[in-house]
Amino acid sequence: MVGLQASGKSTWVAGHLAGTHVVVSKDHWPRARHREARQQRVVAELLAEGRSVVVDNTSPSVAERAPLIAIAAAACVPVRAVFLDVPLGTCRERNDARTGAARVPLVGLHAAAGRLVAPTTAEGFTEVTVVRAVGGEGVLPQAAGPEEERGRGTAAAAIPEGSIAQTCLRPGSAAQP
C-alpha cells in the first residue's frame, strides 16, 4: 500500500485483501524498536511460507519501498503497489476527525506528503493500481464498472498467476516463468 495517513489504506485493505492476505503494518508494533527491520523479517518469513502479504504502511518514497520490493523479488513473488491517490486536504480532514492514537500529528502527515512519490513499475512492482477519492468522500467502490476502472484507476483484481515478466531462479531450481 502507498498513500498518506488517513487516505483510506487500512479501509481499502479490509475491504479488498484482508480475507486473502496477511496484513503486516509497523502500526502493529507501536512501541517496538527497529519496527522497519521487524516488518521486513515478518514479511520475508510469511512469503517463505507461501503466504500472500499486504503491507499497510504509508510507503511514500522509492527508498522506503525498495527493501520490501527486494524481499518479494528474493522470494520470487510478484509485488503490486496499490496507491491511494487522495489529496492532502482530504487526508487532513479525515485525520482531524480521528481521535486518540489514531490521529497523526500534522507534522507527520505533511512530512509524508513531502516525500510522496507515486509508485511505478520501474521500481520493481509487477503492477501499480491507482485508487482515487470520489468527491473527497472515500475511495472508489469495489464494484466499479470497467469504464470507471480504466478512467479512474480503481483497484484491480489480484495479479493473475504467471504474470511475472521476469524469470525467477532459486538455488537448485529450474527457471520459473
Descriptions of predicted regions:
Residues 7-64:
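Conserved substrate/cofactor phosphate-moiety recognition/catalytic segment
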